[in-house]
């Protein structure tokens, strides 16, 4: 069993009183082996975009809607000032057809460690509430202490690379991956990073399906609940290296 305990506490803290009226260079925040999907099937998925001089905003990371004004993503995706980011919602295409929202406040987990990527979670408060519809909806959070069974099937989604250093797709993709045994994951990744109690692993031992560069911060969902945030991994969809997700 894998226990989900960490980032939900931060979320609960940040949302008190709220009314609804870059990991290490050798480890890449990371959909390989998946398929194109429609945003209406994953309406909580957003593109966290960053400003690039005169080019405007471009896709930077994924994120998940947890309320009309709040998005959760990875801390390593949110290390600049709030004005450097916008959240793009409601479209399967990360460059058109959606709605952009300015970021008002960034709350990184106070214990986030850039070297180990521990506590890799951040909250983005939006300047205006997201207009909710069939293409934009909040995802339910797994409860603190809730357990996720090893081998339970999860959905990971995003606009990241479709292969190592491959072309980044404009269209949203998703892949189904099993929750991976925590102890074995820690052993397999021991020479590349530490798998802590604030992390959960997902993927196939043989590889073939995984999140990839550009998917960081995006959702890992089991039975419609958010159980992880794309954080780091060795390459993408490589055998013996399941993806690692912040919890």
Curated annotation (Swiss-Prot):
EC number from the UniProt entry: 3.4.21.4
Localization in the cell: Secreted, Extracellular space
Pro-piece positions: 22-30
Molecular function terms from GO: serine-type endopeptidase activity
Gene3D superfamilies xrefs: Trypsin-like serine proteases
Any matching Pfam family: Trypsin
Signal peptide range in chain numbering: 1-21
Catalytic activity: Preferential cleavage: Arg-|-Xaa, Lys-|-Xaa
Positions of the catalytic residues: 76, 120, 216
Keywords: Disulfide bond, Hydrolase, Protease, Secreted, Serine protease, Signal, Zymogen
InterPro entries: Peptidase_S1_PA, Peptidase_S1_PA_chymotrypsin, Peptidase_S1A, Trypsin_dom, TRYPSIN_HIS, TRYPSIN_SER
Disulfide pattern: 61-77, 185-201, 212-236
Origin: domain of life: Eukaryota
Keyword Signal: yes
Domain Peptidase S1 residue range list: 31-247
Parts forming coiled coils: none
GO BP, one annotated term: proteolysis
Keyword Protease in record: yes
Family statement: Belongs to the peptidase S1 family.
Name of protein: Trypsin
């Amino acid at each position: 069993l894998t226990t989900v305990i960490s980032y939900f506490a931060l979320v609960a803290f940040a949302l008190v009183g709220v009314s609804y009226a870059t990991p290490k260079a050798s480890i890449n925040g990371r959909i390989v082996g998946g398929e194109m999907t429609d945003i209406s099937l994953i309406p909580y998925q957003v593109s966290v975009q960053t400003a690039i001089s005169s080019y405007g905003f471009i896709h930077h990371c994924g994120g998940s809607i947890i309320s009309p004004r709040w998005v959760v993503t990875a801390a390593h995706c949110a290390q600049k000032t709030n004005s450097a980011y916008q959240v793009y919602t409601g479209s399967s295409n990360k460059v058109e057809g959606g709605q952009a929202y300015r970021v008002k406040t960034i709350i990184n987990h106070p214990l986030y460690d850039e070297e180990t990527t521990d506590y890799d979670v951040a909250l983005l408060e939006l300047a205006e509430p997201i207009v909710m519809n069939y293409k934009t909806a909040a995802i339910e959070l797994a409860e603190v202490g809730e357990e996720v069974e090893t081998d339970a099937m999860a959905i990971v989604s995003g606009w990241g690379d479709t292969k190592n250093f491959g072309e980044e797709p404009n269209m949203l993709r998703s892949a189904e991956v099993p929750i991976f045994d925590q102890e074995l994951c820690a052993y397999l990744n021991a020479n590349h990073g530490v798998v802590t109690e604030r992390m959960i692993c997902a993927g196939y031992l043989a590889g073939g399906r995984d999140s990839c560069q550009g998917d960081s911060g995006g959702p890992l969902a089991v039975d419609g609940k958010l159980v992880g945030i794309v954080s780091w991994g060795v390459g993408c969809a490589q055998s013996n290296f399941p993806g690692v997700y912040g919890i």
